């Protein structure tokens, strides 16, 4: 799976974290591992231009998704007929997202992870134009984000335990000499 990130926003964000959450969602949704995804981070001015050009709406927004093909919800490029290798593009605006994060009371990293999940789901055919679609998409979005956060916490604790074990083993070797 190939995920490329191009940060043109001027704001320092963890590209590794964005790739991690996108990869997690793509794997959880059983998307063919050969799929490719592009993520672009823009400043508010560039995002406002894109928002007007594609959605005919003024001002910047937090996330926009540009799927390569229109898919039905649940329709994914699965094997044996994987469909398009390129899922599409997700465009994020960290400056706009930072304001939303502050209002919501969480970090920019958390907000960008949420928006990445949201963007990937749009690429996979999910939408929230109708109330029933919104309920389905937002429930799945919440579930996937919670699972990713739990996975990150578990990986952190495993890394810490591995480091403690390594230090303990190093000390025991020291005393054996």
From Swiss-Prot:
<dbReference type="Pfam" id="PF02130">
    <property type="entry name" value="YbeY"/>
</dbReference>
<dbReference type="GO" id="GO:0008270">
    <property type="term" value="F:zinc ion binding"/>
</dbReference>
<comment type="similarity">
    <text>Belongs to the endoribonuclease YbeY family.</text>
</comment>
<dbReference type="GO" id="GO:0004222">
    <property type="term" value="F:metalloendopeptidase activity"/>
</dbReference>
<dbReference type="InterPro" id="IPR023091">
    <property type="entry name" value="MetalPrtase_cat_dom_sf_prd"/>
</dbReference>
<keyword id="KW-0862">Zinc</keyword>
<dbReference type="InterPro" id="IPR002036">
    <property type="entry name" value="YbeY"/>
</dbReference>
<keyword id="KW-0255">Endonuclease</keyword>
<keyword id="KW-0690">Ribosome biogenesis</keyword>
<comment type="function">
    <text>Single strand-specific metallo-endoribonuclease involved in late-stage 70S ribosome quality control and in maturation of the 3' terminus of the 16S rRNA.</text>
</comment>
<dbReference type="GO" id="GO:0005737">
    <property type="term" value="C:cytoplasm"/>
</dbReference>
<keyword id="KW-0963">Cytoplasm</keyword>
<keyword id="KW-0378">Hydrolase</keyword>
<keyword id="KW-0540">Nuclease</keyword>
<dbReference type="InterPro" id="IPR020549">
    <property type="entry name" value="YbeY_CS"/>
</dbReference>
<dbReference type="GO" id="GO:0004521">
    <property type="term" value="F:RNA endonuclease activity"/>
</dbReference>
<feature type="binding site">
    <location>
        <position position="128"/>
    </location>
    <ligand>
        <name>Zn(2+)</name>
    </ligand>
</feature>
<feature type="binding site">
    <location>
        <position position="122"/>
    </location>
    <ligand>
        <name>Zn(2+)</name>
    </ligand>
</feature>
<keyword id="KW-0698">rRNA processing</keyword>
<keyword id="KW-0479">Metal-binding</keyword>
<dbReference type="GO" id="GO:0006364">
    <property type="term" value="P:rRNA processing"/>
</dbReference>
<feature type="binding site">
    <location>
        <position position="118"/>
    </location>
    <ligand>
        <name>Zn(2+)</name>
    </ligand>
</feature>
<protein>
    <recommendedName>
        <fullName>Endoribonuclease YbeY</fullName>
        <ecNumber>3.1.-.-</ecNumber>
    </recommendedName>
</protein>
